[in-house]
């Protein structure tokens, strides 16, 4: 009987020792979800943005600007060439800048740079693209030689202008909402800080 009691005591000590060593061991099995580790280590696509109006318009703008640029690049001869060169610059610039913003917004990369006002950045991009695409399309329509590539470039230029104009309107609304929300947050923060300052003298008088 005594041997059995000693054996039970030895097993209890061994189990408690193993539990302590297991708790203090640095090599613990991770229970972190796989999706969370992927989100921390890699990029994560935002399907809600791509399904929204601004995301769809961004995709349409990139496609239209690219097609307009391809159409203008197929023209081999021009006289005068100023309108063609201007349209080429506008379509290429709009494609690159809008494409970069689309990648940043769809992958939530802009959240890693909170110092930049991205709503205002998007508004400026869409507004300038609307203006310059409209001017470039009018100039190319007035100075083209009625070739198929030039006519196609003009058509896609005006389509891109329309897409950027709608996006400018939506971006303006989003920017106004963000400005109002920021001002409201600043007001609430200022009220909270003022209440804290007013309550400190009373606390000091009670302490004395």
Curated annotation (Swiss-Prot):
Disulfide bonds: none annotated. It is found in: Membrane. Keywords: Membrane, Phosphoprotein, Transmembrane, Transmembrane helix. Pfam families: MARVEL. Its main location: membrane. Interacts with PD1L1 and CMTM6. This is CKLF-like MARVEL transmembrane domain-containing protein 4.
């Amino acid at each position: 009987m005594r041997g059995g009691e000693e054996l039970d005591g030895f097993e209890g000590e061994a189990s408690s020792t193993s539990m302590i060593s297991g708790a203090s061991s640095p090599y613990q099995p991770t229970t972190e979800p796989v999706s969370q580790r992927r989100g921390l280590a890699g990029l994560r696509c935002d399907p809600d943005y791509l399904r929204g109006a601004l995301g769809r318009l961004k995709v349409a703008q990139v496609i239209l600007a690219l097609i307009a640029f391809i159409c203008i690049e197929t023209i081999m001869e021009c006289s005068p060439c100023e309108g063609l060169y201007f349209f080429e610059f506008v379509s290429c610039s709009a494609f690159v800048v809008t494409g970069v913003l689309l990648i940043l917004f769809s992958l939530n990369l802009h959240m890693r740079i909170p110092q930049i006002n991205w709503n205002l950045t998007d508004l400026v991009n869409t507004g300038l693209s609307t203006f310059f695409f409209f001017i470039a399309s009018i100039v190319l329509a007035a100075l083209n030689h009625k070739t198929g590539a030039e006519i196609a470039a003009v058509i896609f230029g005006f389509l891109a202008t329309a897409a950027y104009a709608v996006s400018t309107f939506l971006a303006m609304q989003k920017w106004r909402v963000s400005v109002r929300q920021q001002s409201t947050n600043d007001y609430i923060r200022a009220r909270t800080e003022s209440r804290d300052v007013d309550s400190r003298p009373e606390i000091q008088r009670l302490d004395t």
